[in-house]
Amino acid sequence: MAIFVTGDTHGSKKLGFFSVDGFMPRLNTESFPEQKSMSKDDFVVILGDFGGIWNNTETKEEAYALDWLDSKPFTTLFVPGNHENYDRLTGIDDADVLNNWMYSKLPDEEKKKLREGFPQKFWHGGMVREIRPSVLMLERGYIFNIDGCDCFAFGGARSHDISGGIFHPEKFKTSKQANAAYKQFEHHASFRINHLSWWQQEMPNHKEMQLGKGNLKKAHNMVDFIFSHDCPASDKTLLIGPNKPDELIVYFEEIKQNTIYKNWFFGHYHDNKRLSGGKDILLYEQIVQIN
């Protein structure tokens, strides 16, 4: 049995000719020949911005890509990043949102899926969302026993590509009103659209953060590996220089200072680097075996 780890995939396909994104080109047999000797008891962990769940409903293209991934000889695990459709992954808490014009034409079955998210189940010591039988999202704050290794998982990150702000189409009564207001946004340098290209659940809530601390305490603050999308505050400073830390990377820094671990793997910064004397590892397109 083996555990491999890789960085952001941003969906199933390449985003451009020179792109290293897309889980299909990255995890095909040509790019990842190790899979030829793997089984479903072997694992590939994607460190956030999986991007395989993006539209409001499952399209034929998305279904094909997820079925393709499920057909691979290994099990795919991912922590969520900041570019994920959390409405579909974990469900919409506010029922009134589903009465909005954005969702009014959806069949009742699709609305039910949006209310509940993907099926949740207990797996290897923690809670996961089952996207496909062998494609699982690791919920925040749990310690999973994977191939005999204790792995703390905590996805999420604050988006840094929203300098133009967040447009909220759900605040308008009709699509016509929303489209008229949208025209004021479309010339901004960089912005996202709530429920369509940005979701506030990209950042964890207090309950999830407390759950993570509690589970680490139960494990005497000792794990083998940590999987996240963003990184501890000190690592971010090493990567980009002085910055204003948000509550998540401060939380991670506290975990870093108080937890004994072998390696911390994260994505988000689109590079491949070793930090903190090699203990903390940023990954993008590289795929590395960790056990």
Predicted regions: what is each one?
Residues 10-12, 51-52, 83-85, 156-160, ...:
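Short, solvent-exposed loop/turn segments at secondary-structure junctions
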Residues 1-4, 135, 143-153, 225, ...:
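Beta-strand-turn-beta hairpins that frame and shape the catalytic cleft
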Residues 8-9, 31, 36-41, 51, ...:
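A structural signal for the main folded, soluble domain(s) of proteins
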